Amino acid sequence: MIGLLRRYPLPVIVLAQLFGTSLWFSINGVWLSLSGELGLAESDLGRLTLSVQAGFIVGTLTLAVTGLADRFGASRIFLVSSVLGALANAGFVLVAGVFPVDSLLRFATGLCLAGIYPLGMKLVIAWTPNYAGAALAWLVGMLTLGTALPH
């Protein structure tokens, strides 16, 4: 795996970013089914989407204020955030419609996205210094596709 990262850093990070950011609007992508099965209102979708955004803001501010992204390896934070985000997202399925637990899990997903989106940018710049501009363009493209993936 390490050899693959060294030989092809850009495809590895942009694909990881694609799948990592798919957590962002995963609930929105299945909302019609969720609302029908659980009888959730449209306002619940707004609450759950807001929970993710709030988690992301708190997470990015925490990373900035504490300097965690500079004290620990960006790839480790990215990995841990991706795994924990996937677990929080999967946990949502078990408690969908149970307020406030569902909101807390979506908030946790947002916190984890703070370790995926900005740290992915840090990784792509560090791993591809000779073509950072093009690499960032690929990364932003994957961020956009990743957030649209659930739809």
Which ranges hold each PLM region?
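Short hydrophobic/alpha-helical segments at membrane-entry points of transmembrane helices
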Residues: I13, V98-R106
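Juxtamembrane helix-start elements in MFS-like secondary transporters
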Residues: A41-T49, V98, L136
